[in-house]
């Protein structure tokens, strides 16, 4: 619509053709509901990438002890005064748990790249919150291989059940006919260790009962933490 015609309509017409066109031009191409959906999905992806939940399909993060502890630590930190001593302690515990999970993931990535999946390793290791056991092609075989990796290698912390997220990755490797090769490489690169060797080589090992105890102390002593905030750190 030309500028002169717009001026004519504004001056002499009672219709709202100009305003309607302007409104149409300003109308968003994507609705708010769609934008909210994309935002939620992006947050879920960031949450999975940051925390590497052992049970990715559990939105409550309560089915496994390690997920439950990490989730409670995150919730407790949200309710703690930023910058306080309690907040810093919680942040250290949270990062310690994340570091252990990242270490396991890095081991898997190294083996995948050694098998030739240089470009595909990240995609193979990505497990979304929508992961479903019903969609797995070889669930029984994948679980058997996961147990083998748990008992016959040092990929995981042998004192805890192996993270379920790697069940989905093994299912993909079975489909690609690379699962047996992966297990063979894992046996070679990460042979099993006894308890003493594991403690020496894994300084980031997580004591879940101790973390829970410290977290409960932080909750019950929240007022004291605010007072301690004014004291100089040692």
Swiss-Prot record:
Key words, A-Z: Cell membrane, Cytoplasmic vesicle, Lipid-binding, Lipoprotein, Lysosome, Membrane, Transport
Database matches in InterPro entries: Melanoregulin
Record protein name field: Melanoregulin
Membrane protein topology class: Peripheral membrane protein; Lipid-anchor
Species the sequence originates in: Danio rerio (Zebrafish)
GO molecular function, one term: phosphatidylinositol binding
Role this protein plays: Probably functions as a cargo-recognition protein that couples cytoplasmic vesicles to the transport machinery. Contributes to retrograde melanosome transport from the cell periphery to the center. Overexpression causes accumulation of late endosomes and/or lysosomes at the microtubule organising center (MTOC) at the center of the cell. Probably binds cholesterol and requires the presence of cholesterol in membranes to function in microtubule-mediated retrograde organelle transport.
GO cellular component terms, semicolon-separated: apical plasma membrane; cytoplasmic vesicle membrane; late endosome membrane; lysosomal membrane; melanosome membrane; organelle membrane
């Amino acid at each position: 619509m030309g500028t002169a015609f717009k001026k004519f309509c504004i001056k002499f017409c009672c219709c709202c053709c100009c305003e309607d066109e302007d409104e149409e031009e300003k109308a968003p191409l994507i609705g708010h509901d769609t934008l909210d959906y994309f935002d939620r999905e992006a947050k879920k992806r960031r949450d999975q990438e940051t925390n590497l939940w052992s049970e990715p399909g559990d939105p409550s993060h309560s089915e496994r002890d390690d997920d439950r502890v990490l989730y409670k630590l995150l919730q407790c930190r949200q309710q703690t005064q930023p910058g306080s001593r309690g907040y810093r302690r919680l942040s250290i515990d949270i990062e310690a748990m994340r570091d252990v999970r990242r270490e396991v993931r890095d081991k898997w990535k190294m083996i995948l790249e050694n098998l030739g999946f240089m470009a595909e390793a990240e995609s193979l290791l990505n497990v979304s919150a929508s992961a479903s056991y019903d969609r797995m092609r070889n669930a029984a075989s994948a679980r058997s291989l996961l147990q083998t990796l748990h008992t016959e290698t040092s990929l995981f912390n042998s004192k805890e059940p192996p993270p379920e997220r790697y069940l989905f990755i093994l299912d993909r490797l079975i489909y690609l006919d690379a699962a047996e090769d992966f297990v063979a490489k894992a046996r070679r690169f990460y042979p099993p260790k006894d308890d003493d060797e594991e403690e020496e080589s894994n300084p980031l090992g997580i004591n879940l009962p101790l973390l829970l105890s410290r977290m409960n102390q932080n909750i019950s002593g929240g007022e004291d933490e605010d007072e301690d905030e004014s004291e100089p750190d040692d």
